[in-house]
């Protein structure tokens, strides 16, 4: 679409159909409603890990089968994990020797 009809006259009648002045025409605004499409987000499932504590550490006797294990001769009950019989040499912060 030409906007020459919207330009001011360029002075005397031109010899050619031209104009040296800029011509800008602004049309009405358009409204568009953009609805977001559904987005599928996959969240990773939980990772379950298990670290059993059924080992005898520093046993001076053969491995016991049953509810009592020993570490350096001091019984360790199978109901939990305890290092209290090791005399404080091993804290929960250091790895125990193999």
Swiss-Prot record:
InterPro entries per UniProt: Keratin
Pfam annotation, one family: Keratin
GO MF annotation, one: structural constituent of cytoskeleton
Keywords annotated in UniProt: Acetylation, Keratin
Source taxon at top rank: Eukaryota
Modified residues (N-acetylserine): 2
GO cellular component: intermediate filament
The protein's assembly and partners: The avian keratins (F-ker, S-ker, C-ker and B-ker) are a complex mixture of very similar polypeptides.
Family: Belongs to the avian keratin family.
Protein name from the UniProt record: Feather beta keratin
Species, as recorded: Mycteria americana (Wood stork)
């Amino acid at each position: 679409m030409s906007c020459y009809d919207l330009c001011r006259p360029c002075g005397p009648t031109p010899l050619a159909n031209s104009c040296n002045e800029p011509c800008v025409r602004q049309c009405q605004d358009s409204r568009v409603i953009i609805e977001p499409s559904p987005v599928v987000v996959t969240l990773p499932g939980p990772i379950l890990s298990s670290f059993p504590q059924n080992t005898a550490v520093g046993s001076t006797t053969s491995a016991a089968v049953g509810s009592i294990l020993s570490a350096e001769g001091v019984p360790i009950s199978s109901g939990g994990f305890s290092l209290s019989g090791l005399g404080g040499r091993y804290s929960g912060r250091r790895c125990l020797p193999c």
